[in-house]
């Protein structure tokens, strides 16, 4: 399945800050955060047991235990992602076409090195390595390297024409496998990047030397993560990221400061995260309202993403109480309101609450502005929120069974599939598991994977209007009380009302106190 990072409605224009000039040299990111204590469950989270076995890891594993996000997306999506608890190795390969200007490659190599593995001082924001070390609270340290340039026998125009005559994905997949074969045959040491069986490269990022096609996000020359056709005769790409060198930013060629937002977003897919923006061109409803790294390539990852990746776990509300949480981006504190049948894992439906502060990984983005068009066609400016406030999400991350990897027709939610006749081959031999919902609704009534609930209500989202400071819940705001618009909120799974309503009772720069009472 193609996963593309798109400029919303193709009208977005980054209005960048002014930077001076820095020397053209690779300065590696050397800081290594000591992992924070970000786990708040009272007991260790057990594997999620599903009622029927499903296939994982390209049909090589049949299991009824879910232990990680990487396992989940290896089933229905057939994607090879970083495994939880293992070192994340990222292999970055610059790809030239036959007609590329080789005189620029030395400089571009240094820009790529700084974008992926460089010190923050060489980037307008963070490098990929520094971002994920900070976003994971020290639980992840991306290691890797930028190889020599691989030169395709095709010109860029020939590759583009081939993609137009067929499809872009087979072309990029073929090039990805060419790259891996070239590395293998040139005695490049692939040890750190191969799966245990030695068949596939995990964490391959190809940076091609050609401008991106901003007018066509389905073009060969765009940014996405995809799975390649697997080849058993030599190590193959399996899953790879694909982006233009020009995503380093136009000014990088002049001042040597690199923009990395696109690369960071695509590496999020290599960890297994989904896009949170609406990918239906005909729908303007934006479930996270541009306000996330997996939406508009901005800021820190949200609590749902970090919960999936086990970088942090929540405080679970099980009785009326007050809970004080600190800045989410700085500490990993967040709260979960469960349903009565919560299974104790990220793969369920619940409410998440986090304290947003324009600090840490949210700091740089807070002072940028972006052009976009709303549902009516009106040009607007998105100012990344710069206030302190509470973000509340409705997450429906329940898993479903599917009988086909390439057809997105679900059989049922996994929790419902308990009475199937085990002798029925339809449900016994070809089951795959994936998320039942995504963030690309055709209609506002569709269930969503990750929905940022606005303090202003839903009208802005329905009209394609971006998040703002007013999206955040502020001091003395309520959620689920008779005086607010969420009093009649119900969960999709059970139809239950919220078990607790909440009030933002105290708010300081570093922490916020949330008071939970029985729903009135």
Predicted regions: what they are:
Residues 368-374, 382-390:
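Short coil-to-beta strand junction motifs in C2/discoidin
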Residues 135, 203-205, 209-369, 398:
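Extracellular hydrolytic enzyme modules, especially secreted metalloproteases
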Residues 1-2:
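N-terminal secretory signal peptides that target proteins for export/translocation
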Residues 322-325, 335-337, 353, 392, ...:
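Hydrophobic beta-strand residues in large extracellular and virion-surface proteins
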Residues 5-21:
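Sec-dependent N-terminal signal peptides of Gram-positive bacterial secreted proteins and lipoproteins
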Residues 87-89, 348, 387:
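Extracytoplasmic
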Residues 24-263, 274-282, 393-520:
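Propeptide-to-catalytic entry region of secreted or membrane-anchored zinc metalloproteases
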């Amino acid at each position: 399945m193609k996963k593309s990072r798109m400029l919303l409605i193709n009208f977005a224009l980054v209005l960048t800050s002014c930077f001076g000039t820095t020397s053209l040299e690779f300065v590696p990111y050397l800081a290594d955060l000591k992992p924070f204590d970000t786990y708040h469950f009272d007991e260790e989270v057990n594997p999620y047991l599903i009622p029927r076995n499903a296939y994982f890891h390209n049909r090589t594993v049949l299991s009824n235990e879910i232990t990680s996000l990487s396992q989940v997306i290896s089933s229905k999506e057939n994607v090879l992602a970083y495994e939880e608890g293992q070192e994340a190795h990222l292999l970055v390969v610059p790809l030239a076409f036959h007609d590329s200007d080789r005189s620029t490659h030395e400089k571009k190599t240094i820009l790529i090195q700084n974008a992926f593995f460089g010190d923050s001082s060489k980037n307008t924001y963070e490098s990929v390595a520094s971002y994920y070390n900070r976003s994971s609270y020290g639980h992840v340290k991306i290691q890797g390297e930028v190889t020599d340039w691989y030169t395709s026998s095709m010109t860029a125009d020939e590759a583009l024409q081939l993609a137009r005559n067929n499809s872009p994905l087979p072309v990029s997949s073929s090039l990805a496998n060419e790259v891996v074969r070239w590395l293998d045959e040139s005695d490049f040491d692939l040890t750190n990047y191969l799966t245990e069986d030695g068949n596939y490269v995990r964490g391959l990022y190809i940076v091609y030397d050609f401008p991106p096609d901003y007018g066509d996000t389905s073009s060969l020359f765009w940014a996405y993560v995809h799975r390649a056709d697997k080849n058993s005769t030599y190590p193959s790409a399996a899953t790879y990221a694909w982006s233009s060198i020009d995503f380093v930013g136009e000014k990088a060629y002049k001042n040597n400061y690199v923009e990395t937002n696109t690369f960071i977003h695509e590496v999020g897919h290599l960890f297994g995260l989904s896009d949170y923006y609406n990918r239906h061109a005909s729908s303007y409803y934006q479930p996270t309202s541009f306000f996330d790294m997996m939406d508009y390539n901005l800021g820190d990852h949200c609590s749902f993403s970090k919960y999936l990746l086990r970088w942090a776990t929540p405080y679970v509300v099980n009785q009326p109480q007050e809970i004080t949480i600190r800045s989410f981006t700085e500490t990993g504190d967040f709260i979960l309101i469960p349903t009565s049948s919560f299974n104790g894992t990220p793969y369920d439906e619940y409410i998440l609450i986090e304290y947003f502060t324009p600090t840490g990984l949210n700091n740089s983005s807070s002072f940028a502005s972006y052009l976009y068009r709303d549902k009516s066609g009106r040009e607007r400016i998105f100012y990344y929120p710069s206030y302190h406030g509470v973000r509340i999400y409705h997450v429906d991350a329940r898993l479903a069974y599917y009988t086909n990897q390439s057809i997105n027709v679900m059989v049922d939610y996994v929790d419902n599939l308990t009475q199937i006749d085990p002798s029925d081959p339809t449900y016994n031999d070809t089951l795959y598991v994936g998320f039942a919902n995504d963030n690309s609704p055709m209609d506002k009534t569709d269930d969503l994977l990750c929905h940022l609930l606005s303090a202003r209500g839903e009208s802005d989202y329905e009209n394609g209007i971006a998040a703002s400071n007013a999206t955040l819940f502020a001091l003395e705001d309520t959620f689920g009380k008779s005086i607010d618009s969420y009093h009649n909120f119900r969960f999709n799974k059970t139809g239950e009302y919220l078990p607790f309503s909440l009030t933002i009772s105290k708010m300081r720069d570093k922490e916020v106190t949330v008071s939970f009472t029985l729903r009135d």
